[in-house]
Design a protein with these regions (language model features):
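Soluble accessory domains appended to multi-pass membrane transport proteins
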Residues: 1-89
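Solvent-exposed, non-transmembrane regulatory segments of membrane-associated proteins
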Residues: 49, 63, 67, 77, ...
Length: 152
């Protein structure tokens, strides 16, 4: 990694501002300066989010079991299309990905320029909410059945 890269290392995530002989200065997303000893960085896993020009945005979203799968996928597709700055190549991925106790899970994967990652992420979440409402898709809400025993 180099100055200007966005990394996760030694339990810290942020933008590298300086690399010196003894430590690396990282600025977090909430604008805190963190000075991390290079020995901590070198001894652990480093994720460089800036090394490639494009990044994949992954969102796992739930819908209630009472929704038609095709309707949910249609709504999610509409949300992706409505989200600016998503890339068409590689193509977006929208699939049913799991069954939970009270919900069906869907995975959405789209690609964006690294600099657009967070805007695409948050805009897509907002567009999913709008598309669910427009298509009548109901969210997943945990349910509870209570059985009352009658006194005899």
């Amino acid at each position: 990694f180099k100055a200007g890269d966005y990394i996760a290392a030694a339990g810290i995530e942020g933008t590298v501002k300086e690399i010196s002989m003894l430590c690396t200065k990282i600025i977090t997303v909430d604008n805190k300066d963190i000075f991390v000893p290079n020995s901590e960085i070198a001894g652990g896993k480093i994720t460089n989010f800036s090394s490639e020009p494009v990044r994949r945005v992954d969102i796992v979203i739930r819908a209630g079991y009472n929704n038609d799968i095709a309707t949910v996928k249609k709504a999610l597709t509409e949300a992706v299309v409505a989200t600016d700055k998503t890339l068409n190549d590689p193509a977006p991925f929208i699939r049913l990905s799991g069954y939970k106790e009270y919900a069906v899970e869907y995975t959405i994967r789209v690609w964006a320029q690294g600099s657009d990652y967070w805007n695409v992420y948050f805009d897509l979440l907002e567009n999913i909410s709008k598309a669910y409402a427009a298509n009548g898709v109901k969210g997943a809400v945990p349910g509870m059945n209570i059985y009352m025993q009658e006194d005899k």
